[in-house]
Amino acid sequence: MGRFLNSIIPYASYEETCTDDYFVDKSLLIDELIPALSKKNRFLCITRPRRFGKSVMANMIGAFFGNVKDSRNIFQNLAISKSPNFSKHLNRHKIIYIDFSRFPRNCTSYEQYINRIQDGINQDLSLAYPDLTIEIGDAVSVSYTHLT
């Protein structure tokens, strides 16, 4: 479990969200995303205006697909549990989770912030895949090509 790769944060955050009195089940969005997993351009960017639930959606996606912790207890009573894709994809994927809403105190520029994220992802990849040669200073795209 790393800071970015296979982070526990999406699971913990979504588990807390599901217990909220005003929780609305939007888990069928996951079923809409599943076909994209088999595409060459399978990387997704979800954009919405402020306060439209982007973080909740990102946490839901990470909690569902991520394989850090069994999230069946969260999703078994949600709409996605009735999908034929439920068991096929629940907790079966590695995820990279980045929260852009928190700018660390020790970062003084956007460039430094992005470098910190790239270095963190590379460190996580190095720990998860010790047989690969991943340099901490490499761009994440370079590290990704080593994995595929």
Kindly give the residue locations of the regions a language model identified.
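Conserved small/polar residues in nucleotide/adenosyl-binding loops
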Residues: T145-T148
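Post-Walker A helix-loop "phosphate-sensing" segment adjacent to the P-loop in P-loop NTPases
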Residues: F64-N73
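The conserved Walker
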Residues: R50
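Hydrophobic anchor at the beta1->P-loop junction of P-loop NTPases
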Residues: I46
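N-terminal pre-Walker A segment at the start of P-loop NTPase domains
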Residues: I9-D31
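P-loop NTPase motor core
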Residues: F75-S126
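Phosphate-binding P-loop
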Residues: I34-N41
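Conserved lysine of the Walker
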Residues: K54
